[in-house]
Amino acid sequence: MSLTLITGPATEPVTLADAKLHLRVDGTVEDALIQTLISAARLTLEAHGNLAMINQTWALRLDRWPGSVVSLPIGPVSAVQAIFVDGIALANEAYVLVPGGEARIARADNAPWRAPSGLAGGIEIRFDAGFGPEGTDVPRHLHHAILMLV
């Protein structure tokens, strides 16, 4: 299994102005450092929580299907863009995003998944994860956690 970031977040969940207010910093001398700290704090929380704060696109590669239901390792998942087996896209109607806390996909018809012909990485699942496109979409407790780490 490998997980690759295809499209990263367009913005950070915490603005430079919010971080500077929290830190009680005036002026612009430390702006680049503070912006770096905001990104580092977000990345740390995302890695520890297996989540995406701002909308991102990911590709999950598998050697074989783990079962009839596939858990996606990052959430919250808003959409599955496509599923490829040996480079060929499955029809969107062939699978569903299972609702619930953990992001999972399953075959819509409960049929078995088509097996890849190769030995490694023959399955690719592209999906969108994140609370939304803006920092205001991120839950307040995560916003506050970023400020505390900064």
Which positions does each model-derived feature cover?
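Divalent metal-cofactor coordination and adjacent catalytic microenvironments
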Residues: 1-149
